């Protein structure tokens, strides 16, 4: 009986993990679409800006950091007129998707040895 319960629990967790992976892939695709439309002009198509070195490099950043930054622009906790305007147009889902997309990209930042 214990083996059956363990098997069922393992099977269900596998199903949920597979579903989460599929949803994650969709989030990244949606995030790329939104980022291309709103963010790429300043932050670069690959999340590494070539326009102005003071613009943050977004590629490879932690998704929770990116999401928090966008939420802070929406709430006014972070101040930048351009970013506040763009962030105001984003839904919670958009923020999660864009954050997942940029986090999925390779980081250009390297530690010097």
Model regions and ranges:
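C-terminal capping alpha-helices of c-type cytochrome domains
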Residues: 15, 75-78, 88-113
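N-terminal signal peptide c-region/cleavage motif recognized by signal peptidases
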Residues: 18-20
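C-type cytochrome heme c attachment motif
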Residues: 36-44, 68-71, 84, 96-100
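Sequence/structural segment immediately N-terminal to covalent heme-attachment motifs in c-type
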Residues: 24-47, 61, 111-113
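Gly/Gly-Pro-rich "capping" loops immediately C-terminal to redox-active cysteine motifs
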Residues: 32, 48-75, 84-88
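Bacterial N-terminal signal peptides that target proteins for export
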Residues: 1-11
């Amino acid at each position: 009986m214990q083996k059956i319960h363990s098997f069922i629990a393992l099977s269900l967790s596998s199903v949920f993990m597979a579903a989460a992976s599929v949803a994650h892939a969709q989030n990244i695709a949606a995030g790329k679409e939104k980022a291309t439309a709103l963010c790429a002009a300043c932050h670069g198509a690959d999340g590494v800006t070539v326009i102005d070195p003071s613009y943050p490099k977004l590629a490879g950043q932690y998704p929770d950091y990116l999401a928090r930054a966008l939420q802070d622009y929406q709430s006014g906790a972070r101040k930048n007129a351009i970013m506040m305007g763009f962030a105001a147009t984003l839904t919670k889902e958009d923020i999660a998707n864009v954050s997942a997309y940029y986090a999925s990209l390779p980081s250009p930042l390297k530690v010097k040895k």
